[in-house]
């Protein structure tokens, strides 16, 4: 069955078997593993997952792809297919019966147009997974793995560093896909970290506000929304003239702790 990729869904199907193998091998699967695949497409990765994992749960939005996947894998005892939108699906509810032992591994070749939205959802629900292997547009991987001081450092970089141990695995050329995209892709491994923040929503809010305008200093971004922002930065050991991309994860945590201790919240301006 031939079905054309839908541009509206950002579909680019991985077709190069060598890269399919590299993505699946990155998961280091055994027959005791449950794998959750987001966006199975025509099933290039799914085929290998069904062969190697004890259980494969796949979520796919496109009904045309559902028909292909059911035809290919419907008779497999270890395969379960969910026709739903990953952006609105409650992963906790979906994976609740298998997630408690943290043996769920997630894999996805994500459409470029929803990749950052999915990633932010995975940050919020990372406790469900033991390991996550994702394929993104290379620019996205460069951003999410950027360290303090790097030119690609941003809001998402800080959130990902706080949530995961990251490993940039390899690049994937445009020719590995059908249709051929205009940009390179890359694969990244994310291993969830335990939470160690007393107020994650505050941490996230501070980081977001500090990167609101990257060319501004952190003080100029924060002083309209936090009372005595300069003093709070100094108490945190942060030069108010620095820019947000230069701060380390520990400095973001210290700043969050200082705000908690001061009992000041964003929205209280000078």
Predicted features, each with a name:
Residues 1-209, 254-270:
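Catalytic cores of RNA-modifying enzymes
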């Amino acid at each position: 069955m031939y079905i054309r990729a839908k541009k509206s869904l950002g579909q680019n199907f991985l077709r190069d078997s060598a890269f399919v193998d590299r993505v699946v091998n990155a998961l280091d699967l055994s027959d005791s593993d449950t794998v959750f695949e987001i966006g199975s497409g025509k099933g290039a990765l799914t085929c290998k997952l069904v062969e190697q994992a004890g259980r494969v749960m796949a979520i796919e939005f496109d009904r045309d792809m559902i028909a292909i996947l059911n035809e290919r894998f419907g008779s497999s005892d270890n395969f379960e297919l969910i026709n739903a939108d990953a952006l609105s699906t409650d992963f906790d509810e979906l994976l609740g019966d298998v997630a408690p032992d943290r043996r769920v591994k997630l894999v996805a070749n994500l459409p470029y147009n929803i990749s950052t939205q999915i990633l932010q959802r995975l940050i919020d629900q990372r406790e469900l997974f033991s390991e996550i292997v994702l394929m993104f547009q290379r620019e996205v991987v460069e951003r999410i793995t950027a360290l303090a001081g790097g030119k690609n450092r941003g809001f998402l970089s800080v959130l990902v560093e706080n949530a995961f141990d990251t490993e940039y695995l390899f690049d994937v050329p445009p020719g590995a896909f059908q249709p051929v995209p205009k940009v390179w892709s890359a694969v990244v491994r994310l291993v969830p970290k335990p939470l160690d923040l007393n107020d994650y929503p505050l941490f996230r809010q501070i980081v977001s506000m500090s990167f609101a305008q990257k060319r501004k200093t952190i003080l100029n971004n924060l002083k309209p929304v936090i009372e005595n922002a300069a003093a709070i930065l100094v108490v945190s050991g942060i030069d108010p003239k620095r820019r947000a991309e230069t701060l380390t994860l520990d400095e973001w945590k210290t700043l969050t702790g200082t705000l908690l201790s001061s009992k000041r919240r964003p929205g209280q301006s000078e």
